[in-house]
Regions:
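Short polybasic amphipathic segments
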Residues: 2-6, 73-75, 99
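C-terminal boundary/linker segments immediately following FHA domains
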Residues: 57, 76-114
Length: 114
């Protein structure tokens, strides 16, 4: 267990393997990997895409990847300006980072012990 992902919607997901996030997430497992967990974000305004982003688990590291979302995935890191992620370009994650899905929801990376 590398940590937890806490959504502003109240959902909490243990980061044991990949997590795909969106209004109607769907995913095919990467070769040699278990099926990703699907985290549904309820968004009446539809600012989040159906398949918005993924949190990738690679050995002992975490990364976030925008999956071609319409309104963008943003990385909010303490002490730095918010940054929009380039689509399909994984970005390393650390405990304390916040992922913003357009204006629909935020996902906070927490330590597994919290």
């Amino acid at each position: 267990l590398l940590g937890r992902l806490r959504a502003s919607t109240g959902a909490v997901v243990d980061l044991r393997h990949d997590v795909v996030v969106g209004r109607a997430p769907a995913a095919t497992p990467r070769p040699g990997r278990p099926s990703p967990e699907l985290l549904i974000i309820t968004d009446a305004d539809k600012s989040a895409s159906k398949v918005h982003c993924a949190v990738r688990v690679e050995d002992w590291d975490l990364a976030v990847e925008d999956l071609g979302s319409s309104n963008g995935t943003f990385l909010l890191r303490p002490g730095r300006a918010p940054r929009r992620l380039a689509p399909h370009s994984p970005e390393p994650l650390a405990v304390g980072d916040v992922i913003s899905l357009a204006d629909a929801a935020t996902l906070t990376v927490e330590d597994a012990d919290e």
